[in-house]
Structure formats: structure tokens, C-alpha cells
């Protein structure tokens, strides 16, 4: 599929389907749209009246045009209130149009959308992202894939002449999102610690990044007892992934993105029981997937920022070698941890990853993880939790989320709650009381960052959706990739 800007006037464009964005309660056709309606014998006005179209956000209607016309179908999509127009409004509207056009077997699709904030580059990027994200399909594990039907071949963005770079940026970012989607969606017998390490090596080879894969023996030498405690039960070896992107010249900043990479979480000896959703625990490496997806995108975009992509990857399994409830692990910064729940393993892997990252001399660290069910209880399935003691980093992340349209909410870091993590025989326990569980998880991670500005994103909810939601189909969403890329690009401005 080719997405391209077009300087073709609306009244002269020809193709299979033409999509027009209209604001809520402003669907009266005027100016160029009125002329277009006359050209098509009043079919637009008739369609709006018959369907009682009001322009509500993401609502769509379409009609076929009489044979012999330059356009076969007209699609109207609602954009909501004009004063509420956001980039994500355009992204979601474009996704809705793309699905309609594909269902109608359109090969050539045109968009006539208004600008967000008089910014053609950002608007073109959002529309292109919406189309590409919505049309993604994962059929790798189908023995007889369903008929995909007619595919959209060309998308023209009318009125966006000169915005090739914005569309290219959208392509680069979406390539990272789709990599993350593929990794999260794949079962644990397809994506293992070995697989993720190989994926990192492939990204490095394809895009010129530096890569280092630390094996178990390397991690032992670095004293990564927390990470290795999680990994010790599995027959598969742990892999500590470190990808590095370095720009030409002196970087403006040095950043790290750390992703939780538990490729399957059985819960360990505190095994996940019936009704726990254990069959979904292939997605417990969603943070690592987003990290690798961001690496793929950033390697193509080439910002003036040095970025380290890190993940301590392992399975949390059950065997005669498994860590026991009550075991004491020593992390690589010397902190001792009483494991009172083997199913709170992600924070143990992140602990050593954070210590490792801080030694790189960074300006900021962001980790993201499918860390707690408590965050899902607090914020639901669509919103990630943002935990940080640093207001500047919080503002950067929130700004990036506004651009990407990925929902996030800053949560408190109530230091008093750390009392619940205190241990009688070690420096801390790995879990505290049930109330405030997402906060105590973030406070646990905070013990492994000394001075570097740091933020933790709990993405347990939005990493997956059970049904179609905007530009995400049912399944893995690739949450975090676009947010992280926008964070890095914002730092590099």
C-alpha cells in the first residue's frame, strides 16, 4: 500500500472511494463540498439526510455513485466538535474510513480532511498512521488464512502536497508498532528469550545499531541476582538485551528505554490458578516488545539523541530449580530482596536492568512493563499508569502521549507506602499489601535508581484489547511504541 500526498483538487480527484471528514453539527455542505455535491447530483446531501448523519466522532456512512463517475463511492466520517479536534481524532477517523474502504473492496482511496492546529505535517502523519494501524493483519498462525479480499493499494491525502516526510515518519513509526504487535501476539512457544535476542540482533543488523546480548554467565558476573532468580526455573536461558542507537556527532541527550521481558509468566511456585488468565501471559513481555519496536522506529528516524534499549528477558516457570517464596535475592546494586510472591517477578527483572542502565551515564530512563493488575483495577484497560518523582520527565511523557494518542495518567508516588515493603530479614520484600499495589510496585523500582531522572509506565491494561478499538484490532496493540518515539523526538528537538 502506498500513501502519498496529492495536490489534485478535490473536484478533479478520481478513484474508488473518496472520504470526507465533517464536524459534528456542521454537516451542511458549503463551498467546495457543495460544488462536489452538485457534481454528483446531490448524492451527498441526500445521504446526510437519509442517514441522519450528525458528524459524531468516528461515525461513518457511505454511498455508491452512479456508474461512469470518476469516484465509485463516497464515505463521510464524523470528526466530532471542531473545538475538540485532536491529532488522535484524525487518526481514529482515518482508521474508520480505512476499514470501510477495505470492506467495500476499494483499491484507490482519497482523503479530504481538515488540518489539526493548521499543521499539515502532523495532520498528514496522523492520517497515515490511522490507515496503516487499522489495516494491520496478523495471519501467521492460520493454516488456511481467511480470504483477505481486495486490498487498498493507493491512499491519496488531498491538500497535503509536500508532506512526503510526514508520511515517511508515519511509516517508520508504524513499522515499530507492528513489530511490537507481532511479538506480543505470538505464543510463548514462538517468542522466547532466544527469539527476542535474535530479534534485537536482526534490528541491529538491518539498521546499523550496536547490540550486546549478555548471557547467564555475564549476568552472574554483574551480580544480577534478582533477574537470575526469576530465570532459574526455566529450561530456556535468560538473555539480557542491550541495543544502542547513536546519532552522528554529539548527541543532545542520552536516554534509556527499558522493557519488561517475561516471555511467559506461570507465576512460579505462587502459580497462577484457574481464572487467572494464565493463558494470556504470553503478553507479559509487552514492555520488551515496545522497546524493540521503538528501537526499530528510532533507528530509521535517526534523531540527534543517543538511546539505549534494554530488556532482561526470561521465563517465570516452575521446576525443581524454581525460586521459593521466602527466598532472598541480591540485586546488582547490593540490595537484598525477600521474595514473598514469585508472581511479582517483573519488578525483579527490572531492578537489575535499571541498575545496569544507570551506569551508562544517562539523562533520563523510562521503563515500561505489564507490571500489575492493580493498575488495571485503578485505570481500566485503556490507560497506562505513569509513576515518577520527576515533574520534568512526567511533562515530557504526558506531551508525548498527547501527540501519540495513547492514554496515560500520572499516579502518586506515596513514599509512606514503602513501609509495606519492609522486610524483617532483607532490605525489602518484592510485594506489599494489596491496597495501592501499583504504587508499591513503582516504589520498589525506585530503589534501583539513584540519581537519574526516571519514570515507570505500567502498561498492563492497554497492551492488549479483546475487541476492535479505534485503530487497534482485537489483540496486541503495540502500546507504548508511538509514545516512546515521540518522547525521544521531543527530547531531540
Swiss-Prot record:
E.C. designation(s): 3.4.11.1, 3.4.11.10
Reactions mediated catalytically: Release of an N-terminal amino acid, Xaa-|-Yaa-, in which Xaa is preferably Leu, but may be other amino acids including Pro although not Arg or Lys, and Yaa may be Pro. Amino acid amides and methyl esters are also readily hydrolyzed, but rates on arylamides are exceedingly low; Release of an N-terminal amino acid, preferentially leucine, but not glutamic or aspartic acids
Domain of life where this protein originates: Bacteria
Annotated keywords: Aminopeptidase, Cytoplasm, Hydrolase, Manganese, Metal-binding, Protease
Gene Ontology MF terms: manganese ion binding; metalloaminopeptidase activity
Positions bound to Mn(2+) 1: 265, 343, 345
Listed Gene3D superfamilies: Leucine Aminopeptidase, subunit E, domain 1 (3.40.220.10), Zn peptidases (3.40.630.10)
Binding site for Mn(2+) 2: 260, 265, 284, 345
InterPro entries hit by this protein: Leucine_aapep/pepB, Macro_dom-like, Peptidase_M17_C, Peptidase_M17_leu_NH2_pept, Peptidase_M17_N
Single biological process term from Gene Ontology: proteolysis
Principal location class: cytoplasm
GO cellular component, one term: cytoplasm
Cofactor: Mn(2+)
Co-factor note (free text): Binds 2 manganese ions per subunit.
Subcellular localization, as worded in the UniProt entry: Cytoplasm
HAMAP family, A to Z: Cytosol_peptidase_M17
Primary role: Presumably involved in the processing and regular turnover of intracellular proteins. Catalyzes the removal of unsubstituted N-terminal amino acids from various peptides.
NCBIfam families: PRK00913.1-2, PRK00913.1-4, PRK00913.2-3, PRK00913.3-5
Family, as annotated: Belongs to the peptidase M17 family.
Protein name: Probable cytosol aminopeptidase
Amino acid at each position: 500500500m502506498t500513501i502519498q500526498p496529492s495536490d489534485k483538487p478535490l473536484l478533479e480527484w478520481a478513484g474508488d472511494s473518496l472520504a470526507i471528514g465533517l464536524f459534528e453539527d456542521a454537516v451542511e455542505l458549503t463551498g467546495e463540498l457543495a460544488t462536489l455535491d452538485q457534481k454528483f447530483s446531490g448524492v451527498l446531501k441526500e445521504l446526510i439526510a437519509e442517514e441522519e448523519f450528525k458528524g459524531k466522532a468516528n461515525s461513518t456512512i457511505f454511498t455508491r455513485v452512479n456508474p461512469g463517475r470518476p469516484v465509485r463511492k463516497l464515505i463521510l466520517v464524523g470528526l466530532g466538535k471542531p473545538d475538540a479536534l485532536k491529532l488522535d481524532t484524525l487518526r481514529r477517523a482515518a482508521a474508520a474510513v480505512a476499514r470501510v474502504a477495505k470492506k467495500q473492496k476499494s483499491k484507490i482511496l482519497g482523503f479530504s480532511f481538515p488540518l489539526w492546529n493548521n499543521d499539515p505535517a502532523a495532520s498528514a502523519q496522523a492520517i497515515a498512521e490511522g490507515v496503516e494501524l487499522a489495516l494491520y493483519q496478523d495471519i501467521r498462525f492460520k493454516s488456511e488464512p481467511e480470504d483477505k479480499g481486495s486490498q487498498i493499494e493507493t491512499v491519496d491525502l488531498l491538500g497535503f502536497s509536500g508532506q512526503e516526510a510526514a508520511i515517511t515518519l508515519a511509516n517508520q513509526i508504524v513499522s515499530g508498532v507492528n513489530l511490537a504487535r507481532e511479538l506480543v501476539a505470538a505464543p510463548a512457544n514462538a517468542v522466547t528469550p532466544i527469539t527476542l535476542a535474535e530479534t534485537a540482533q536482526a534490528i541491529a543488523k538491518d539498521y546499523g545499531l550496536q547490540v550486546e546480548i549478555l548471557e547467564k554467565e555475564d549476568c552472574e558476573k554483574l551480580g544480577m541476582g534478582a533477574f537470575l532468580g526469576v530465570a532459574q526455573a526455566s529450561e530456556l536461558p535468560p538473555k539480557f538485551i542491550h541495543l544502542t542507537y547513536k546519532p552522528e556527532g554529539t548527541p543532545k541527550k542520552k536516554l534509556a528505554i527499558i522493557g519488561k521481558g517475561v516471555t511467559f509468566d506461570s507465576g512460579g511456585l505462587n502459580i497462577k490458578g484457574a481464572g487467572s488468565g494464565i493463558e494470556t501471559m504470553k503478553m507479559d513481555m509487552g514492555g520488551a516488545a515496545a522497546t524493540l519496536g521503538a528501537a526499530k522506529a528510532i533507528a530509521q528516524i535517526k534523531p540527534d539523541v543517543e538511546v539505549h534499549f534494554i530488556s532482561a528477558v526470561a521465563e517465570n516457570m516452575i521446576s525443581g530449580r524454581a525460586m521459593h517464596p521466602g527466598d532472598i535475592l541480591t540485586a546488582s546494586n547490593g540490595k537484598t530482596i525477600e521474595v514473598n510472591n514469585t508472581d511479582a517477578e517483573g519488578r525483579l527483572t527490572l531492578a537489575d536492568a535499571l541498575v545496569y542502565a544507570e551506569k551508562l551515564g544517562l539523562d533520563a530512563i523510562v521503563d515500561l512493563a505489564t507490571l500489575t493488575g492493580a493498575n488495571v483495577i485503578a485505570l481500566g484497560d485503556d490507560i497506562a499508569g505513569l509513576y515518577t518523582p520527576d515533574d520534568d520527565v512526567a511533562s515530557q511523557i504526558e506531551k508525548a502521549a498527547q501527540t501519540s494518542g495513547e492514554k496515560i495518567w500520572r499516579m502518586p508516588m506515596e513514599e509512606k507506602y514503602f513501609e509495606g515493603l519492609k522486610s524483617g530479614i532483607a532490605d525489602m520484600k518484592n510485594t506489599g499489601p494489596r491496597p495501592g499495589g501499583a504504587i508499591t510496585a513503582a516504589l520498589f523500582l525506585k530503589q534501583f535508581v539513584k540519581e537519574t531522572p526516571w519514570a515507570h509506565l505500567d502498561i498492563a491494561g492497554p497492551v492488549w484489547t479483546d475487541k476492535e478499538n479505534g485503530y487497534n484490532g482485537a489483540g496486541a496493540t503495540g502500546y507504548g511504541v508511538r509514545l516512546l518515539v515521540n518522547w525521544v523526538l521531543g527530547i531531540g528537538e
